[in-house]
Amino acid sequence: KAKEAGITAVIASDQAVIMTARTIGIEVHISTQLNVTNIETVKFYAMFADTIVLSRELSLRQVKKITEDIEKEQVKGPSGNLVEIEIFGHGALCMAVSGKCYLSLHSHNSSANRGACKQNCRKKYTVIDQESGFEIEVDNEYLMSPKDLCTLDFLDQVIDSGIKVLKIEGRGRAADYVATVIKTYREAIDSYYEGTFTKEKINTWMEALATVYNRGFWSGYYLGQKLGEWSDNPGSNATQKK
C-alpha cells in the first residue's frame, strides 16, 4: 500500500521490513533505532540503503570521521552512489541509547522501535532508598525527561561534518510547530551557504524556535557533552501560548 501511495522511502530498523521493502522496490532509509555508530556498521547497511540515520549519541567529530571514511573507502549503497549520512537536527531526544529503550514495551506492550513509545520518561518520578524506605529529595522530579535537541546555533559545524540530510522532528507535532521549525532551519541553511550565517541572525532564529512547543533546548552530544540535560516540567516552555 505504501508503494501504491507513491511514498518515496520508508524508515526501517527491522531487518525483515528492510528486506521486504527492498524486494518490492521501495527505497529504505536506515533508522536511528539501529544505533549506527561506526563505519563498519555503515558498510553493512549500505547493502540495503543509500541513506543511513546515525545514532543520536555521537559527537560531530565522530560523525565527520564516518562521512570522511565513506568518501575514503567509497562506501556505496544499492544505487551505486556514495551512502548519504543523516543526523537528527531538532526535536525530542530519547533518555536511552538510540533504539535501546524498552520502558514503553515493558509497561504498556507498546514498542518505541515500532513508533509507539508511551513516553514513560516524560513523567515525574520519586526516588526511594530501598534499604531505608526513605524518599530522597531531588531538585527535579523529571528524572528521565531530556531537553529538546537544537542544533541551529552551531549549524555551520553540523553542515561541515559532511552530513547530507538533517532530520527534524515532525511526527505528532502541531502544524505551527512544523512550519516554524522547518522555515527557521531552511533560512539558516540557506544563510550558511550564502555566507551570512551570523550571531545576530542566530539570535533571531532561536527566538522563533522558542515560540513553539519545546522542553528547553540543548546541543545533545554533538559538541562532546557526556551527560544529558533534563527538562523540569511535563509540558512546553514555548514563549507563546496557543
Give the label of every model feature segment:
Residues 1-3, 12, 27, 43-46, ...:
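Surface-exposed amphipathic alpha-helical tracts and adjacent flexible/coil segments at the periphery
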Residues 1-44:
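N-terminal active-site wall of soluble small-molecule enzyme domains
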